[in-house]
C-alpha cells in the first residue's frame, strides 16, 4: 500500500528491463512512487517491479483500438496527495489526457518523458501532439533534434530539457574496462571475415533483411562478411527465410535473446561494426558504449532520438 509520503508520482506505460538502473537511481534519490503498465502491443522484457523501491502498483493497459489504450486505475492517482506527475509523453494513452486535464484543475505539475517530435507528423498528428504537450508543465525530451523541431512548432524552449537516453552505464563501464579481443567469432564461423553485429528486438521496422541483401552483394564482389543477430523475433520477421534465400546460413549467427551484459560486451567489442538499417534506437548507445561504430540511415524523421550519438566518419 502506498503511504503517499512521496511528492512525485511516475506513471509509465511499462517498466522495461533496461530502465531498471535509472528507475532505481530515481527511487534512491527522489521522493518517487512508481506505477507501471502490464503490457505493450509489441512484446518486450519487463523489469522485476517488486525489486524496485517505491513500486506501488501494476496497471492494466487496455487496448481499445489501433494503438490507443487506457491505463486502468491510473486516473484516480491524480486525486492523491502528489505534487508532481511524470508521464510517458504518449498521446495514444487516453487516460493520460484525463490526468492532464485534472492536474490543470487541481494546480498540480506534470512532466512528460517523451520522444517529442519526429519530423514526419501529418497535419492531424501535429494538431493532436501540440494540444497534448501543451497540457504539460514541463517536457523531458530525448534529443536536441526533437527540441529544435518543437521550438519551430511554437513550443517554449525554456520548458523543454534534453535528457537523452541510456542503459546501465556504470555496470557497462566496469565490463568495458575488462574486455579484450577474443576468438568468439573465429571459433563460431571458422573464418576471420569482418563481423557485422545487431542487437535488439527483431522487428520489421529494423529492416534487417537489407543487411542480408548487402551481404550477398559483398560476397559476389569478393568481400564476404559475417553477421551476428542478438535478439528475439517479436514481429514475424522470419529472418532465417531471407538467409536461406541467399544461401548465407554459414555466415549468419542468429544468437537469439541475451541479457548477459558480460557476453554482450564481448560480442560488441569483437565485432567490426554494428548495423541497424531501420531506426537505430538504443542499439546505438549500447554499441558506442563498447567502442563499436554504428551504421544506420540518415533520414532523421524516421530515426530514433539516439541517432544523435553517431558522428559521421568518427563513430559511424
How would you describe each model-predicted region?
Residues 230, 237-258:
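Nucleotide-activated donor-binding/catalytic signature segment of Leloir-type glycosyltransferases, i.e.
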Residues 9, 187-206, 212-215:
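Conserved donor-binding/catalytic core segment of Leloir-type glycosyltransferases
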Residues 106-127, 135-138:
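A short, histidine- and acid-enriched strand-loop-helix "catalytic/donor-clamping" loop
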Residues 1-59, 80:
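N-terminal subdomain of nucleotide-sugar transferases
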Residues 266-282, 292-293, 299-300:
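Acidic donor-binding loop of glycosyltransferase active sites
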Residues 257, 265-271, 287:
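Short alpha-helical donor nucleotide-sugar binding micro-motif in glycosyltransferases
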Amino acid at each position: 500500500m502506498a503511504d503517499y509520503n512521496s511528492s512525485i508520482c511516475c506513471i509509465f506505460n511499462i517498466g522495461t528491463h533496461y530502465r531498471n538502473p535509472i528507475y532505481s537511481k530515481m527511487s534512491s534519490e527522489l521522493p518517487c512512487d512508481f506505477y507501471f503498465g502490464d503490457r505493450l502491443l509489441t512484446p518486450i522484457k519487463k523489469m522485476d517491479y517488486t525489486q524496485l523501491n517505491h513500486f506501488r502498483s501494476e496497471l492494466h493497459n487496455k487496448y481499445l483500438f489501433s494503438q490507443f489504450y487506457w491505463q486502468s486505475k491510473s486516473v484516480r492517482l491524480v486525486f492523491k496527495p502528489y505534487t508532481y506527475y511524470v508521464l510517458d509523453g504518449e498521446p495514444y494513452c487516453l487516460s493520460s489526457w484525463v490526468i492532464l486535464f485534472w492536474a490543470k484543475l487541481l494546480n498540480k505539475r506534470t512532466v512528460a518523458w517523451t520522444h517529442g517530435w519526429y519530423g514526419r507528423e501529418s497535419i492531424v498528428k501535429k494538431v493532436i501532439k501540440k494540444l497534448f504537450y501543451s497540457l504539460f508543465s514541463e517536457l523531458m525530451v530525448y534529443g536536441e533534434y526533437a527540441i529544435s523541431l518543437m521550438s519551430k512548432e511554437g513550443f517554449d524552449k525554456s520548458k523543454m530539457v534534453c535528457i537523452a537516453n541510456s542503459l546501465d552505464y556504470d555496470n557497462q563501464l566496469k565490463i568495458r574496462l575488462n574486455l579484450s579481443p577474443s576468438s568468439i567469432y573465429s571459433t563460431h564461423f571458422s573464418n576471420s571475415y569482418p563481423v557485422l553485429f545487431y542487437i535488439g528486438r527483431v522487428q520489421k521496422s529494423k529492416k534487417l533483411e537489407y543487411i542480408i541483401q548487402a551481404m550477398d552483394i559483398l560476397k559476389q564482389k569478393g568481400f564476404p562478411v559475417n553477421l551476428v543477430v542478438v535478439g528475439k523475433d517479436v514481429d514475424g520477421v522470419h529472418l532465417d527465410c531471407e538467409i536461406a534465400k541467399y544461401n548465407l546460413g554459414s555466415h549468419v549467427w542468429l544468437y537469439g535473446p541475451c541479457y548477459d551484459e558480460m557476453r554482450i560486451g564481448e560480442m560488441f567489442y569483437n565485432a567490426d561494426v554494428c548495423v541497424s538499417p531501420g531506426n537505430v534506437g538504443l542499439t546505438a548507445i549500447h554499441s558506442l558504449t563498447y567502442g563499436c561504430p554504428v551504421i544506420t540511415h540518415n533520414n532523421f524523421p524516421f530515426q530514433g532520438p539516439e541517432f544523435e550519438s553517431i558522428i559521421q566518419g568518427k563513430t559511424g
